[in-house]
Every structure is written in structure tokens, then in C-alpha cells.
């Protein structure tokens, strides 16, 4: 857990001081090893044949070691800019426990840092992807809503237009039907009037004709009767004259 925390802090420090992650990890490995095995480092420094001394520590390392021993936050990382990282890499290989202790810790820390970096990148990528997906989903929902609204408005407009057209056609049909009915009624009334007039005229004409015929017949009958009566009288008179003539001849 301590290495993970150091790795994360080191990553922050690397970004702040423009150092590579490997250089930060090497510094953290040596600082933690000195802190955990201080007596061994003191003994090594006292051995003149080791070529190692506390005074030969890379610049800035001792200051960071002291700050790290009492650190309660990551403020000690501000001292990283004062460290000679090239000298730190050289010092790691000078101590006799480099291969047995420092290198495994460094490899572990580098692996953790790589994992943490990968995790951070993956998290950032996932977040970006989620944001992009959310934006696309939102855009798609807004587009669908706009299309649905446009479709609803269009349908409503079409329905209104259709209803208005149907109403207008119905009104026009009703008006036409009413006009036709009125015209038909007027025509029927005119026809009835014409028929009544024609019938009345015909009846009047017929009555007049019949009257004239009747008058004619009466006149004719009267004339015939008069002529018959006159003829009969004349015949009687004639016959009387004849008889009287015959009687005279006989006498």
C-alpha cells in the first residue's frame, strides 16, 4: 500500500517537475530503502572501501529523505526539482543489496506505476467514451423528440387540413344540395303552376268549345225543328190544296 501511495505521489511529482516516471521511481525506492534500513546505510558509509558515503548522496536526496520521514502530505514532492536524478541512478547500483532488494522493489514499483497509469488512461478513456455515448444518446433523444414533434405537428396539420377540406367539401355539398333542392322545388313549383295554368286553359278552352258546340247544336236543332215544322205545315197546306183540287175535279 505504501508503494502504491508513493507511486501515485511520484506520478504527480513527475508531472510537476518534468521528470520521467522511472527517475521518480528510482528516487522513491532509494528513499524508502534508506528509511527502512538506515543502519545498513550508515555502516556502508563508514566502510571506506565501499566507495559510498552519506556526503556523496545525490543533491536533494537527504533533504527529501528528512521531509519524507515526517511528511503528512505530498508537499515534499516540491523538492524533486532539486534532485540530481542521474546521480540517484548511479547510486542504486553502488550498494551491495541493489540486485537482491532495490531492483525487485523498483520493478514492482514500475509495474504498479504502469498499472496505475494504464488504469488512469483506461478510466479517462472510459469516462470520455461514456461522455461521448451520453452526448450521442442525448443528441439522438433530442433528434428523435424533434422528429416526433415535427411528425406530430405535420400529422396535426394534415389532420386539420383534411378536416378543413372535408368540412369545406361537406359545406359545399350541402350548399349544392340545398341549391339543387331549391332549384328542383322551384322547377316543380313552376311545372305545377304551368301544369295548372295549362290545365285551366285547356279546361276553359274545352268548356268554351263544348259550350260553342252545345250552342251550335241547339241552334241547329232549333233550325231543323223550325224547318221541319215549316215544311210539315207547308206539306199539310199543299196536301189540303191537292185534296181540294181533286174534290173539285170530281165534282
Swiss-Prot record:
Q: Where is the lipid attached (GPI-anchor amidated glycine)?
A: 231
Q: Where are the PIR1/2/ repeats?
A: 207-225
Q: Where in the cell is it found?
A: Secreted, Cell wall; Membrane
Explain the induction of this protein: Induced during anaerobic growth and strongly by cold shock.
**Keyword Ligase annotated:** no
Q: What GO cellular component is one of the record's annotations?
A: fungal-type vacuole
* Transmembrane domains' residue ranges: none
How this protein is processed and modified after translation, per its record?
Answer: The GPI-anchor is attached to the protein in the endoplasmic reticulum and serves to target the protein to the cell surface. There, the glucosamine-inositol phospholipid moiety is cleaved off and the GPI-modified mannoprotein is covalently attached via its lipidless GPI glycan remnant to the 1,6-beta-glucan of the outer cell wall layer.
Residue span of the signal peptide, if any? 1-18
Classify the source by domain of life.
Eukaryota
Cleaved propeptide residues:
232-251
Q: Which Pfam families match?
A: PIR, SRP1_TIP1
Q: Where is this site: Covalent attachment to cell wall glycan?
A: 217
- What is known about what this protein does? Component of the cell wall.
| Record's protein name | Cold shock-induced protein TIR2
- Organism this protein belongs to: Saccharomyces cerevisiae (strain ATCC 204508 / S288c) (Baker's yeast)
Amino acid at each position: 500500500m505504501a508503494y502504491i501511495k508513493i507511486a501515485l505521489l511520484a506520478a504527480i511529482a513527475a508531472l510537476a517537475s518534468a521528470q520521467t516516471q522511472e527517475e521518480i521511481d528510482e528516487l522513491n525506492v532509494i528513499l524508502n530503502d534508506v528509511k527502512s534500513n538506515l543502519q545498513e546505510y550508515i555502516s556502508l558509509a563508514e566502510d571506506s572501501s565501499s566507495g559510498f558515503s552519506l556526503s556523496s548522496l545525490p543533491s536533494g536526496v537527504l533533504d527529501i529523505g528528512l521531509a519524507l520521514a515526517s511528511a503528512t502530505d505530498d508537499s515534499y514532492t516540491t523538492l524533486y526539482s532539486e534532485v540530481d536524478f542521474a546521480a540517484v541512478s548511479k547510486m542504486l547500483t553502488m550498494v551491495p543489496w541493489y540486485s537482491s532488494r532495490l531492483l525487485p522493489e523498483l520493478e514492482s514499483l514500475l509495474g504498479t506505476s504502469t498499472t496505475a497509469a494504464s488504469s488512469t488512461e483506461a478510466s479517462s478513456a472510459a469516462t470520455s467514451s461514456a461522455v461521448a455515448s451520453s452526448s450521442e444518446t442525448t443528441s439522438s433523444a433530442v433528434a428523435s423528440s424533434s422528429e416526433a414533434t415535427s411528425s406530430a405537428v405535420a400529422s396535426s396539420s394534415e389532420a386539420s387540413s383534411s378536416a378543413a377540406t372535408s368540412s369545406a367539401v361537406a359545406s359545399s355539398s350541402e350548399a349544392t344540395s340545398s341549391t339543387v333542392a331549391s332549384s328542383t322545388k322551384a322547377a316543380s313549383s313552376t311545372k305545377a303552376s304551368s301544369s295548372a295554368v295549362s290545365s285551366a286553359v285547356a279546361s276553359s278552352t274545352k268548356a268554351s268549345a263544348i259550350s260553342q258546340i252545345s250552342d251550335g247544336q241547339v241552334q241547329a236543332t232549333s233550325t231543323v225543328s223550325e224547318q221541319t215544322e215549316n215544311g210539315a205545315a207547308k206539306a199539310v197546306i199543299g196536301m189540303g190544296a191537292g185534296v181540294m183540287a181533286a174534290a173539285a175535279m170530281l165534282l
